Regions:
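Extreme N-terminal starter segment of soluble prokaryotic enzymes
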Residues: 4-9
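Short hydrophobic segments within beta-strands
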Residues: 11-13, 44
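Helix N-cap/beta->alpha junction signal
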Residues: 14-15, 139
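Short N-terminal binding/cap micro-motifs at the start of the first secondary-structure element
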Residues: 17-21, 52
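Glycine-rich phosphate- or other oxyanion-binding loops that anchor nucleotides, phosphorylated ligands
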Residues: 31-236
Length: 236
């Protein structure tokens, strides 16, 4: 069902990635996607990974007819110069699985989308192969949807894990619907104390990244909600 048109649709994996932006905004579940309607934008939260991102982006386009799609969330750094909380805008997004490349508006960095969380060694390989600055798990899919529908595409990420950060083994706890199985992961971690301090640090990093990302998105929503379609070129 079509809803009142929103010129900006933001696609995210989890609500907590944009917690400050969404504070006090009720979510509406439709087609397995949770929608948060802001004054000049809608946030579509579909889950982690490619399939979830595709579902959220397609549902947002169908329901709200946006002229701009923004892939937003927390991500990993592929260069030592990027620090926790830094907000990065992409100029190009590479799909590591297919090799497809998508142009994003207003950015200066290369981002690469992968299918699983990357540790330091994987990050080094990705940086060397793609000359990329940032790694995530959804961005390229949003770029593909934007290209298919002929609308503007932005990639905006905030760093939660730096280049040399050793991520906990979280990939195996994402179910087929892109949802993170928190209870099962907690049971796994409870008997593995070597990861406790890492998780505390990651939680603090993610809160900082979420705050900075939300502030950046507030400015972008205002900018793109008051910009004509012609001014949004280049498109995906």
């Amino acid at each position: 069902m079509a809803m009142p048109r929103k010129s900006v649709a933001i696609i995210a994996a989890m609500p907590r990635e944009l917690a400050p932006l969404l504070r006090g905004v009720p979510g509406q579940l439709a087609d397995s996607v949770e929608f948060f309607e802001l004054e000049n934008a809608v946030v579509a939260v579909g889950g982690i990974g490619r399939i979830a991102a595709w579902s959220a982006a397609e549902a947002a386009v169908k329901r709200y007819q946006p002229s701009t799609l923004i892939s937003a969330g927390i991500a990993g750094a592929l260069t030592a110069s990027l620090k926790v909380g830094d907000v990065v805008r992409g100029s190009e997004v590479v799909d590591a699985d297919s090799g497809a490349r998508f142009t994003a508006s207003g950015g200066e960095s290369v981002m690469v989308t992968v299918s699983s969380v990357s540790g330091p060694e994987d990050k080094r390989l990705l940086a060397d192969r793609y000359k990329a600055d940032v790694v995530d798990m959804e961005c390229a899919v949003v770029g593909a949807v934007a290209r298919e529908h002929g609308i503007a595409f932005l990639a905006v990420k905030a760093i939660s894990d730096e280049f040399d950060f050793e991520m906990p083994p979280m990939a195996g706890f994402v179910n087929g619907n892109g949802k993170f199985e928190t209870a099962r992961f907690a049971a796994y971690i409870a008997v593995r104390p070597k990861w406790w301090s890492t998780l505390r640090q990651l939680a603090a990093n993610s809160r900082k990244a979420s705050m900075n990302l939300s502030h950046a998105l507030e400015h972008l929503i205002y900018e793109y909600a008051n910009t004509t379609q012609e001014e949004k070129i280049p498109r995906a």
